[in-house]
């Protein structure tokens, strides 16, 4: 492990801060990020490099849950014509750099391993720190902790974010999206940037610093209005949740119900 510790979020600086209005309440908005199974439909282009259906989910007491969503594995949903390691590497590198696609996968390395090495070198150049002691999963995977009631923390190197969902009326929410990067080892930490505010109809790609993830966040939240309308018009009074893939969504509501029951006696 790195001596800096990936869990040391206080050793990060805020590089980008987005506040996006969403057309769904804070619970529905948070649910969009509690599971990885939606990749197949919501991020269909990602199925060749994302282990969605085989993501790992863990629950720690009433207030904390986690998923580990691997990058560089092809989805189990793809049963035929699965890409080679070279093809996976091309996709990963093409997303990160304009000139990356087409580079030969180094001998003896998987696409994940080679891509993680590239990310470590890229971040070393940008932030003048050595990240070579980090594991592949610490470097590139989507490792997400949810802290009840409304906060998410990603302690990885490539994917280092914080989410917060706040009520904004009955059927609206404010989504704080913060991209974190390593603090300088020497010298003062730069001041946090002003928040970039987006309306419901605005794309995340309007905000500088979101890079290729801006379009991904558009996909994550573009269906929230339809969900809200569906909740209000459905004859069914509750959600039908998967036993495992949506365990964290159930966990959120079970914990919330405990607090409401205590308050109401």
PLM regions and their residue ranges:
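Short amphipathic
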Residues: 13-23
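Single conserved hydrophobic/aromatic residue that forms the stacking wall/gate
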Residues: 1-6, 10
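Acidic/His-leaning functional-site neighborhoods
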Residues: 11, 38
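Glycine-enriched catalytic-core subsegment of oxygenase/oxidase enzymes
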Residues: 30, 34, 40-265
């Amino acid at each position: 492990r790195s001596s800096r510790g990936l869990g040391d979020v206080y050793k990060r600086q805020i590089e980008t801060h987005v506040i996006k209005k969403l057309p769904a309440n804070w619970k529905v908005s948070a649910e969009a990020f509690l599971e990885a199974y939606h990749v197949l439909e919501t991020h269909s282009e990602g199925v060749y490099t994302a282990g969605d259906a085989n993501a790992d989910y863990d629950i720690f007491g009433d207030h904390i849950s986690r998923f580990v969503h691997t990058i560089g594995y092809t989805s189990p949903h793809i049963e035929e014509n699965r890409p080679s390691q070279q093809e996976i590497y091309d996709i990963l590198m093409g997303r990160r750099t304009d000139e990356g696609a087409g580079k030969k996968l180094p001998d003896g390395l998987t696409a994940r391993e080679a891509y993680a090495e590239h990310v470590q070198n890229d971040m070393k150049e940008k932030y003048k720190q050595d990240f070579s002691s980090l594991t592949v999963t610490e470097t590139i995977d989507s490792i997400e902790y949810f802290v009840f009631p409304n906060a998410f923390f990603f302690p990885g190197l490539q994917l280092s974010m914080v989410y917060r969902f706040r009520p904004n009326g009955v059927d609206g929410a404010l989504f704080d999206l913060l991209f974190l990067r390593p603090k300088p080892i020497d010298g003062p930490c730069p001041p946090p940037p002003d928040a970039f505010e987006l309306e419901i109809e605005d794309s995340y790609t309007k905000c500088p610093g979101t890079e290729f993830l801006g379009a991904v966040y558009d996909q994550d939240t573009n269906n929230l209005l339809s969900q809200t309308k569906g909740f209000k018009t459905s004859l069914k009074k509750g959600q039908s949740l998967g036993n495992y893939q949506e365990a964290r969504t159930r966990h959120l509501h079970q914990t919330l119900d405990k607090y409401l029951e205590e308050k109401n006696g």
